[in-house]
Design a protein with these regions (language model features):
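Short, positively charged and aromatic/hydrophobic N-terminal segments
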Residues: 1-3
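Auxiliary tRNA-acceptor-end handling modules of aminoacyl-tRNA synthetases
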Residues: 5-24
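Positively charged, Gly/Ser-enriched RNA/tRNA-binding surfaces
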Residues: 23-41, 52-53, 69, 87-100, ...
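Polyanion/phosphate-binding surface patch
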Residues: 50-82
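Short, conserved phosphate-binding/catalytic loop or strand-edge motifs used
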Residues: 124-130, 165-173
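A generic structural motif
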Residues: 164-165, 188-192, 381-390
């Protein structure tokens, strides 16, 4: 059956979106603010392909079985199996393992990723991640620096957030304390990570499918109690094994470093059930959420990450351990929050990049000369090339949010002037070309 244009569904694939200029400009301004923050902290840009070899994405060192359920796969004409990247961390690991890069290697990447998973407010199947990662630093001071960067980034965006913090070593230590077998810990961790999302009874049901009901109930009770306390002192007093104690020690050092980085008290909150779903995390993990004071209906995390000391080394032939830590900001969900709260960033957003509409009065040569002069001074402008009426041009400028209109006729050319209209005030003036250029630049 031949599909004609008339028969085709013109909407984008489910879970993807088109961004019209007004929204795209908002997103661009948010990206620019994030890039500025990332670079202030010494992170450099890196770009990788949207497509990766399937073996890289499906590697046991990569995201794990949960994420593979959401992987988009395809074959090229050479029958090679490929996949769309589901995050920007695995491509970073591949690049670092295949290149001779000096450490510490601090990079940021801003790009689309794809996951064929469930959708909800602020969550899509194609979405943009804004990642920062530092490779080659084993000290938890690196986590503290990333926390400072996170605080600065959300402050620049005008959002009041807090970050949940935990340590996978402590989490493993708590599961060991409960007597949960090592082989069962990864699926148990995945379910505990859902405590706030599906509630205690939902988690209990899932845990009972993995471990004995008695263990499941005991685990749920312990983590529920610890979540209420949210105190490192409580877990520090428990009879934990070596791994658990190391997790506590790292968290204490992390918190003591935050003050030196200028991170205020209460920004990073200890959350003992926080696990992060991806298997490659090895140490401190974190996840950022809006504070209730924002009054948003969006409950999804805005950023998340952690330490993954084993991932990059296992991609390399030498198989050495290479310390790494990073965080990923969700551009889409942050943009949704900003729109929802009608923040300053949205109020000042514009519909177009155009600053000046140049209108010829049957004098295209002069109008084009003026437009080129404007562009030479860095002013974005567009020219009416269709000979529309004055009223139609003014209506267009008003609808598009173009702040100025310049009229160029034979008389204006003769006097080496232009008629300049301020669309906000409605005032018009006849100005010399040099003075108009200065005013518009």
């Amino acid at each position: 059956m031949i599909i004609t244009v008339e028969m085709a569904d013109l909407s984008p694939p489910r879970g993807t979106r088109d961004f019209l200029p007004e929204e795209k400009l908002l997103r661009n301004s948010l990206v620019a603010a994030l890039q500025k923050t990332f670079e202030k902290y010494g992170f450099n840009p890196l770009e990788t392909p949207a497509l990766e070899n399937y073996d890289i994405l499906a590697s046991k060192f990569a995201g794990g079985s949960e994420i593979l359920k959401e992987l988009y796969t395809l074959e090229d004409q050479g029958k090679r199996k490929l996949g769309l990247r589901y995050d920007l961390t695995v491509p970073l690991a591949r690049v670092f393992a295949s290149q001779k890069l000096a450490m510490p290697f601090k990079r940021y990447a801003i790009a689309s990723v794809w996951r064929d998973g469930p959708m909800k407010a602020g969550r899509y199947r194609e979405f943009t991640q804004c990642d920062v990662d530092a490779v080659g630093v084993s000290s938890v001071r690196q986590e503290a620096e990333i926390m400072a960067l996170t605080y600065a980034a959300f402050k620049a965006a005008g959002l009041d957030v807090f970050v949940k913090v935990n340590n996978r070593k402590l989490l493993n230590g708590l599961l060991d304390f409960l007597g949960i077998p090592e082989a069962k810990r990864v699926p148990v961790i995945i379910e505990l990570d859902k405590l706030e999302k599906i509630g205690a009874q939902g988690v209990l049901k899932e845990l009972e499918a993995i471990i004995e009901p008695g263990y499941a109930k005991e685990a749920l009770e312990l983590f529920t109690e610890l979540e209420i306390e949210k105190s490192l002192r409580v877990v520090e007093g428990m009879a934990l094994g070596e791994e658990g104690k190391q997790g506590v020690s790292e968290l204490k050092e992390f918190y003591s470093s935050l003050e030196a980085f200028g991170v205020p008290d209460g920004f990073a909150v200890f959350s003992p059930s926080l696990a992060r779903g991806l298997n490659y995390y090895t140490g401190i993990v974190f996840e950022a959420f809006l504070k209730e004071s924002e009054g948003s209906g969006i409950k999804s995390s805005l950023a998340a990450g952690g330490r993954y000391d084993d991932l990059i080394g296992k991609f390399s032939r030498a198989k050495e351990k290479i310390p790494a830590v990073g965080i990923s900001f969700g551009l889409d969900v942050i943009a949704e929050v900003l729109k929802e709260k009608n923040a300053k960033l949205v109020k000042t957003s514009k519909k177009t990049v155009v600053r000046v509409l140049v209108v010829p009065f049957q004098n295209y040569a002069y109008a084009l000369k003026v437009s080129q002069e404007l562009r030479a001074r860095g002013v974005a402008c567009t020219v009416d090339l269709d000979g529309k009426s004055v009223s139609r041009n003014l209506d267009f400028a008003n609808k598009q949010g173009i702040p100025f209109v310049v009229f160029c006729g034979a008389q204006e050319e003769k006097e080496k002037k232009v008629k300049l209209r301020d669309m906000q005030s409605g005032k018009e003036e006849l100005a010399s070309l040099p003075s108009a250029l200065v005013k518009l630049a």
